[in-house]
Amino acid sequence: NTCEDIVDIKKEVDLPVIGIIKSVYDDSDVYITPTMKEIDALAATGVEIIALNATDRPRPNGLDLDTLFKEARAKYPNQLFMADCSCYEDCKHAAEIGFDLVGTTLCGYTAKTKGTAIPNYDLLSRITTELNVPVIAEGGVWERGQLQKVFSYPVHAAVIGTAITRPRDITRRFVEAIS
């Protein structure tokens, strides 16, 4: 979540890295790489993919996604950009404006998608068949069977996050299973 983390990871891992910066602004619920300030900082790290919130929610300072992405693409024409989306409409719009990849990252985390079961297999099915852009399945993959089902769709890759990176959440799931 920081540029320092990205630089350190890139020293140790010979794989493409998806970079984000989480920044909170008073006038917006969008916090994943919400402005050019964060995009500039990420680009300076040499990260392979910059992910940013691509939902239709208002961005900081009243900026809209289309304007931000147009500026980012013009400034960094060779940079790969991933759209962190919550629903089909977000994914479709992101593909239309030129994002290189779309991810299901924010499904279940916006007012529009709150309560949606994740991984959202219906969303994966629809975007992998209807959109002509690589899809990154992200969100809610905790079990091997879920990952196998995710890969039954023609996704480009899957991100396993909390299931392996947050010991407190991992422990809570085990405790809940025996309570």
Q: What do the PLM-derived regions correspond to, one by one?
A:
Residues I39-A43, V47, L52-N53:
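Extended substrate/RNA-proximal surfaces in nucleic-acid metabolism proteins
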Residues I18-I20, D100-C107:
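Non-cysteine beta-strand/loop elements that form the S-adenosyl-L-methionine
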Residues F69, Y76-P77, F151-T162:
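Short, electropositive alpha-helical surface patch
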Residues V13-D27, R73-A83, T128-E138:
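Short beta-strand/loop segments at the ligand-binding rim of alpha/beta enzyme cores
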Residues N1-I18, D29-M36, A54-A74, Y88-H93, ...:
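Active-site-adjacent beta->alpha loops and helix N-cap segments on the catalytic face
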Residues I50-L52, M82, G103, V159:
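Conserved beta-strand positions in the central sheet of alpha/beta enzyme cores
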Residues D27-A41, S86-G98, L131-A137, V141-A158:
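Catalytic cores of alpha/beta
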